[in-house]
A protein has these predicted regions:
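The feature marks proteins involved in alpha-glucan
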Residues: 1-14, 26, 472-480
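Conserved alpha/beta catalytic core and glycan-binding cleft of carbohydrate-active enzymes
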Residues: 165-167, 182-376, 405-452, 457, ...
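Conserved, mostly hydrophobic/aromatic
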Residues: 17, 42, 52, 71, ...
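C-terminal accessory region downstream of the catalytic core in glycan-modifying enzymes
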Residues: 400, 450-484
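Substrate-binding/active-site clefts of carbohydrate-active enzymes
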Residues: 5-9, 18-199, 498
Length: 517
């Protein structure tokens, strides 16, 4: 049917999904199963944008959809094209924007299924010689200087917009596209690392053309660049000399969270460095932050919750079970997600299941695991079971997302640091009409903790420590605080005096009306 969906003009709160592994059973899920069983969960969770992975046809299921063979075909293992259209239409009726994970950075090297040697040569769509081979991915690299390649890829963008009514794209592997050596084994530390002889200017030209075409076809479409190098201008408007992406991912944020958890004791977390990393972005480019995506949960890596709790998750997630490692993990999981969202530039992303602390890692069926689907699924029963703690994390995430939408948190780009204490592991900042208070110290609580704040009345509207979120409940719910005047030279200061429990966070609202939905 003709597209009738009109996207709301609000910052994207993205729920990243893989249709095949979204089901509970140890098998490949379908578009129909996703529409009936998973889509309602996403709507209930409060996210406003759905990002679909692995849509383009790919021969090897374990590639996570990134080794594409047919760029114009939805993956047949998930169902028919009509099933995908029904999924998107249903999501639209629920108010969800639907984005597609678009793979234009390379193509599968398989010659029977893919484009390689399509006309008998290696260079019809790709570079000839060594440059046509991606050494890290064992795939073929497009030659973006060829008109037939530009026509092929640009028409592919329009095809998914027109035929399936996608609302935009996440462009995968942008770093690999724009550098001749694909950005491999390279550290980008200054502006001198950009715009030198290592740049593939043809690839940058293609990306600019793609953004122009997409926004001509759908002026309200969303395009997101996945780039780890920090190339300036990717998400700047073309009218200002940029390449036209609407957003770029803040990919340093999840890497920094993993580094903190792996390399530092809780009492040694460098709070100043954390604050810098959370806010390290250019003012002229919109960014989307996240604590973890599918990348952090792949085999060989671990989700944040599993890094924090580990094997204790198997035996100590009962609602009445008290375990110090579990308590620590649950507290930090909530705090990490809250501060990542609260400091996000212009959008936020979550990978399916991470909102309730899905255990373990993602491991697609392969020879090394006897072709098992055990870790290529989502165990929704964990969050449905009221006798386990997973549903408490899900409840917190629901209320956190609702708070961001109700208070239009990400509409306000200015994040104002009010107070930072590295020794005590305290960060306090203001955004919109909200004050966010974080005490990352693992064992020190602070009474009568004072910091300067705008004068007024403040009500606590979200508390990570609350029992309904799996916390010990050390604060009175919905308590109200008033600033006090401290006489100091050369001028007086308005101060808030608060109790800060160890390893906890809460949000204060500066108004007389309660903003909660």
């Amino acid at each position: 049917k003709k597209p009738t969906f009109k996207r709301k003009k609000e910052p994207p709160l993205i729920y990243e999904v893989h249709v095949g592994m979204a089901q509970e059973e140890e098998k490949i899920g379908t578009f129909q199963e996703f529409t009936h069983n998973v889509l309602p969960r996403i709507v209930d969770a409060g996210y406003n944008t759905l990002q679909l992975m692995a849509i383009q046809e790919h021969p090897y299921y374990g590639s996570f959809g990134y080794q594409v063979s047919n760029f114009f075909a939805p993956s047949s293992r998930f169902g028919t094209p009509e099933d995908l259209k029904k999924l998107i239409d249903t999501a639209h009726t629920q108010g969800l924007t639907v984005l597609m994970d678009l793979i234009h950075s390379h193509s599968v090297s398989n010659e029977i299924e893919g484009l390689s040697r399509f006309d008998g040569t290696l260079f019809q769509y790709f570079h000839d010689g060594p440059r046509g081979k991606h050494k890290a991915w064992d795939s073929r690299c497009f030659d973006y200087n060829k008109h037939q390649v530009l026509h092929f890829l640009l028409s592919n963008c329009r095809y998914w917009l027109d035929e399936f009514h996608f609302d935009g794209f996440r462009f995968d592997g942008v770093t690999s596209m724009i550098y001749l050596q694909h950005g491999l084994s390279r550290i980008f530390t200054s502006y001198n690392d950009y715009f030198d002889n290592s740049i593939d200017e043809d690839a940058l030209t293609y990306l600019a053309l793609a953004n122009r075409v997409i926004h001509c076809v759908r002026p309200d479409a969303i395009t997101i660049a996945e780039d780890v190098s920090g190339m300036p201008g990717l998400a700047a408007p073309q009218s200002n000399g940029g390449f036209g992406f609407d957003y770029r991912f803040a990919m340093g944020v999840p890497d920094y969270w993993i580094r903190l958890i792996k390399e530092f004791k809780d009492e040694d977390w460098p709070i100043g460095h954390l604050w810098f990393e959370l806010n390290n972005r250019r003012n002229d480019e919109k960014t989307i932050s996240y604590a973890e995506s599918h990348d952090q949960a792949l085999v060989g890596d671990q989700s944040i919750i599993f890094r924090l709790i580990g094997k204790e998750m198997y035996n100590h997630m009962g609602i009445n079970d008290h375990n110090l490692k579990v308590d620590r993990g649950i507290a930090l999981h909530k705090m990490i997600r809250l501060i990542t969202l609260a400091t996000a530039g212009n959008g936020y992303l979550n990978f399916m299941g991470n909102e309730f602390g899905h255990p373990e890692w993602i491991d697609f069926p392969r020879e090394g695991n006897n072709w098992s689907y055990k870790n290529a699924r989502r165990q929704w029963h964990l969050t449905d079971n009221v006798h386990l703690k997973y549903h408490l994390l899900a409840e917190f995430d629901n209320d956190m997302i609702a708070l961001a939408r109700t208070c239009r948190l990400l509409d306000q780009s200015n994040v104002q640091l009010l107070h930072e204490d590295t020794a005590k592991k305290v960060i306090i900042f203001k955004r919109a009409d909200l004050i966010f208070v974080f005490n990352f110290h693992p064992y020190c609580s602070f009474t009568d903790y004072r910091f300067e704040a705008p004068p007024g009345k403040y009500q606590m509207i979200l508390d990570c420590d609350a029992p309904e979120y799996g916390g010990p409940g050390r604060l009175l719910p919905k308590q109200t605080h008033f600033t006090i005047m401290e006489k100091q030279k050369p001028q007086n200061h308005h101060m808030l005096s608060l109790y800060l429990p160890a390893r906890s966070a809460f949000v204060l609202y500066s108004a007389t009306e309660d903003p909660q939905p």
